Amino acid sequence: MDYGRARIGLAIADAVAGLPQPLGVLVRINRNEDMRRLREMVREHGVKRIVVGLPLRLDGTRGEMAQEAERFAQRVQKQIGVPVEMVDERLTSWEAERLLEEFAGRIIHAQTPLGAKRESLKKKQKKKEEGKNSVDAIAAAVILREYLEGQRTNEKRGVEA
């Protein structure tokens, strides 16, 4: 999960293949409703462990958002009953934006007909919001990838997580 005050980016990985995939974005409503919807998703997808990104500052210290994310992770574990682990998420949103731009650039280039008209302002605003949602979900997949790579490294070293 990529925790945010307005949205929570979600990703999932198959236990066998371990390939993280963006799942979507949970638009925040309130604590109770957010937990209800997360509980439903956890049940629907058979989630055995939840990974929440810890937004540390670049110097590694915990700021306000990191403290919020920690409290959120504690609530998730208590209310949903699935083990929760936190992973340093520094620069994951930046990486997600880079991946999205790279991927979107390929799609737009391939699909835009020559001489296409400019989009209306409403369409641009809608795409911008969809882009934010995509970035949050991709950031969650990047966080999950970091966690899984750390697990694999520990397994190779013979260290238990």
What are these regions (language model features)?
Residues 1-2:
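Two-metal-ion RNase H-like nuclease active-site motif
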